[in-house]
Amino acid sequence: MKRVAAVIEYDGSNFFGYQGQPDVRTVQGVIEDALERIFKQRIYIQAAGRTDTGVHANGQLIAFNCPNDRMTTEDIRNAMNANLPDDVYVKEVFEVPVNFHPRFDVTKRIYHYFILTSRQKNVFLRKYVWWFPYELDLDAMRKAVKYLEGTHDFTSFKTGSDERDPVRTIYRIRILRLKNDLVLIRVEGRSFLRRMVRNIVAALVKVGLKQWEPEKMKEVLEARDRSAAAGTAPAHGLYFYKVLF
């Protein structure tokens, strides 16, 4: 039996998040159902991250034990894509060591968040970007992210139900103005708390609107209090873009 990993992408619009749950449609659930059809037995998968309801992925990484040693990685990829719904796609399959675990062996996770600042709504993008028809001061936002980069206690930017260690490391945050009034916020780190990226985006938007000075980010971070921060940016603007390991 060999162990394989797969890079997958999915449109999170019609999923109740990644993690398997009874009686609702999840990314993990549809992948494990597809693998069961292929291998005629239940195959359990592990993932590099558990995206929330409505969050998308370009480069989620999963791993599982393949019970058929005769199948090549290309055979596995083709079989999975033939059995998956059209909002999930396997981009690549490759062999990994038998003890590989995507959650623990990944060294960097990269998230992308898209904000559409045009005055007019784009109905075709409504599930894939946060439509926010206001001018944002990107220079001020870039100053604010410097307080977040590095290793800190991110209690102010976590969801209340997350009981894990709040100390996390953000390697880098980039804020880019793209074509057609799109703003990209790219966040790179080893691991993240639940809704941490979306909570950071909401705080950066406060700075971009000039409701907060960039230095306010340091104050919020040091407060270690969720109520000191802003709200939470919508899920549909967030993409689990890529992992490195």
UniProtKB/Swiss-Prot annotation:
Catalytic-site annotation from UniProt: 52
Pfam families: PseudoU_synth_1
Catalytic activity, reaction form: uridine(38/39/40) in tRNA = pseudouridine(38/39/40) in tRNA
Keyword list, A-Z: Isomerase, tRNA processing
Top-level taxon in the UniProt lineage: Bacteria
EC number in record: 5.4.99.12
InterPro entries associated with the record: PsdUridine_synth_cat_dom_sf, PsdUridine_synth_TruA, PsdUridine_synth_TruA_a/b_dom, PsdUridine_synth_TruA_C, TruA/RsuA/RluB/E/F_N
One example of a Gene Ontology biological process annotation: tRNA pseudouridine synthesis
Gene3D superfamilies attached to this UniProt entry: Pseudouridine synthase I, catalytic domain, C-terminal subdomain (3.30.70.660), Pseudouridine synthase I, catalytic domain, N-terminal subdomain (3.30.70.580)
Enzyme class: isomerase
Family assignment from sequence similarity: Belongs to the tRNA pseudouridine synthase TruA family.
Function description: Formation of pseudouridine at positions 38, 39 and 40 in the anticodon stem and loop of transfer RNAs.
Summary of subunit composition and partner proteins: Homodimer.
Protein name: tRNA pseudouridine synthase A
Gene name tied to this protein: truA
